[in-house]
Every structure is written in structure tokens, then in C-alpha cells.
From Swiss-Prot:
Motif CX5R motif, residue numbers: 106-112
Catalytic activity: a 1,2-diacyl-sn-glycero-3-phospho-(1D-myo-inositol-4,5-bisphosphate) + H2O = a 1,2-diacyl-sn-glycero-3-phospho-(1D-myo-inositol-5-phosphate) + phosphate
Biased composition (Basic and acidic residues): 1-10
Keywords tagged on the record: Endosome, Hydrolase, Lipid metabolism, Lysosome, Membrane, Transmembrane, Transmembrane helix
Descriptive protein name: Type II phosphatidylinositol 4,5-bisphosphate 4-phosphatase
Species this chain originates from: Xenopus laevis
Function: Catalyzes the hydrolysis of phosphatidylinositol-4,5-bisphosphate (PtdIns-4,5-P2) to phosphatidylinositol-4-phosphate (PtdIns-4-P).
Entries under InterPro entries matching the protein: PtdIns-P2-Ptase
Domain of life: Eukaryota
Biased composition (Polar residues): 13-22
Top-tier EC class: hydrolase
EC number of this enzyme: 3.1.3.78
Database matches in Pfam families: Tmemb_55A
């Protein structure tokens, strides 16, 4: 919005000011997470003779040269190396600014989003979806802790949000797409169960083989019962090997 008495299309820096370093106050980190929408873009002529369009960085307020970048949705600041949106997000998307100043893009119906930076990994709760006009300032998200647990993957070591409220279940890591067990009680319990069932079925098969040999020579259908007993026992032992070899993932902090 233009100031009183100043045309919104007038240059931010007058031609008589020369090469002046922007004197905007330093960026102060807000506590609340913000869903960031780009301002309505207006090409602003720079003080040089070429009239190159520029825009202020949303993080450090430095001027960003937009020459040759007007087709992009976001541009990168050469001072702080952070991204600044210059166009509205694609249809069905929205911008979110993480407290570490990383600009993220997600679906406009998303409730949570994770920061991909290794030194942050923050889970951002976006709160209920609201349609915000572009002219309005960015609205802070609700400061609500996510309902779930941060879990360290047993395969890749990355942290992800696990939404189950009980332990000893399986979880799929969104980073490596592999399945692991949250806690070790469930795999051990199922491994012992399948070993017991497999050995029982194999012993039954051995008993049938020894005890019904003469009967099987007259009634060949008896061989089917042998095969079923051995097959069920083998399947149980294979499942026991699966549960015995599964990786364990452990929770970091619980917010539930």
C-alpha cells in the first residue's frame, strides 16, 4: 500500500539519492510461524539509467534485482541467500516462512509441514486453513504443538513426525520410504510367536508323515495334509525371520 501523498508506482529510491545502501531496520525473528503470501508485485524502477525492476527482500530488506527473473515465482537474495516470493503461488499452493527464514511451499489445505534444513527440522503446525487476501499481512499460525511424536528412523537416521499415540507399531519413514518398528517389544513378541507356530506345524507334519505312511499308500490325498503342515510351518518361520530382522525406530520427544 502506498504512503499518503505518494504514488504506489513511484520509485522507492529517488534518482537524486545516488547509490545508497538500504537502511531498513534489521529483521527481527517472530515467535509465531507465519504462512507467507507474496505482496502484489509492481515493477519498481531502480535509480540507475536502465530502470531495472527491484523488490525488497522479505528477510533482510535488501534490494533484489529482478532483471530477467520476472517469470519466476520466487527470487533469491544475494545478501542473506533467502527466497522472496514475487508472484502468487501456483494454484492450490501457499507459501510458509519457517522461523529459520526458509521459504516453503505446500498445499493450501496442509495442516503441517516439515522444514527440510538439516539444522532445523522443525515441524510447523499451520492451523486451520484460511483464505487471506494478498493485500493483508501474513497471518500467524496457531501456536499449537503437533499431536504426535518425533521418531528417529532406524534405517536412515532422519527424524519424522509419527502420529500414532501408542508404541510398538510399525511406522513408514517419509524420507527413505522404509518400514521400521517403533520400539522393540512388538517385533520380539511376534518373532517368538511365529517361531512357536512354525515349529508346532513342522512337528505336526513329521507326526503325520511317520504315523500315516501305510494309510497314505492307499489314500494319496493324505499327502496333501503333509504338504499343508510343512508349508504352514515354513511360512511361519519366514515371518519369524522378517520380524527378527526388522529395524527399530525410537521416539525423541512426545507431544501427546
Amino acid at each position: 500500500m502506498a504512503a499518503d501523498g505518494i504514488d504506489e508506482r513511484s520509485p522507492l529510491i529517488s534518482p537524486s539519492s545516488g547509490n545508497v545502501t538500504p537502511t531498513a531496520p534489521p529483521y527481527i525473528q517472530e515467535n509465531n510461524l507465519q504462512a507467507e503470501l507474496p505482496p502484489p508485485y509492481t515493477a519498481i524502477a531502480s535509480p540507475d539509467a536502465g530502470g531495472v525492476p527491484v523488490i525488497n527482500c522479505r528477510v533482510c530488506q535488501s534490494l533484489i534485482n529482478l532483471d530477467g527473473k520476472l517469470h519466476q515465482h520466487v527470487v533469491k537474495c544475494t545478501v542473506c541467500n533467502e527466497a522472496t516470493p514475487i508472484k502468487t503461488p501456483p494454484l492450490g499452493k501457499k507459501y510458509v516462512r519457517c522461523p529459520c527464514n526458509c521459504l516453503l511451499i505446500c498445499k493450501d489445505i496442509s495442516r503441517r509441514i516439515g522444514c527440510p534444513r538439516p539444522n532445523c527440522r522443525r515441524i510447523i503446525n499451520l492451523g486451520p486453513v484460511m483464505l487471506i487476501p494478498e493485500e493483508q499481512p501474513a497471518q500467524p499460525a496457531l501456536p499449537v504443538q503437533p499431536d504426535g511424536t518425533r521418531v528417529v528412523c532406524g534405517h536412515c537416521g532422519n527424524t519424522f513426525l509419527w502420529m500414532e499415540l501408542r508404541f510398538n507399531t510399525l511406522a513408514k519413514c517419509p524420507h527413505c520410504k522404509k518400514i521400521s518398528s517403533v520400539g522393540s517389544a512388538l517385533p520380539r513378541r511376534r518373532c517368538c510367536t511365529y517361531i512357536t507356530m512354525g515349529m508346532i506345524c513342522i512337528f505336526i507334519g513329521v507326526g503325520l508323515t511317520v504315523g500315516t505312511q501305510d494309510f497314505a499308500r492307499r489314500f494319496h490325498a493324505t499327502y496333501v495334509s503333509w504338504a499343508v503342515a510343512y508349508l504352514v510351518g515354513l511360512v511361519c518361520l519366514v515371518r519369524a525371520c522378517y520380524w527378527g530382522a526388522i529395524k527399530f525406530s525410537y521416539p525423541e520427544h512426545s507431544f501427546a
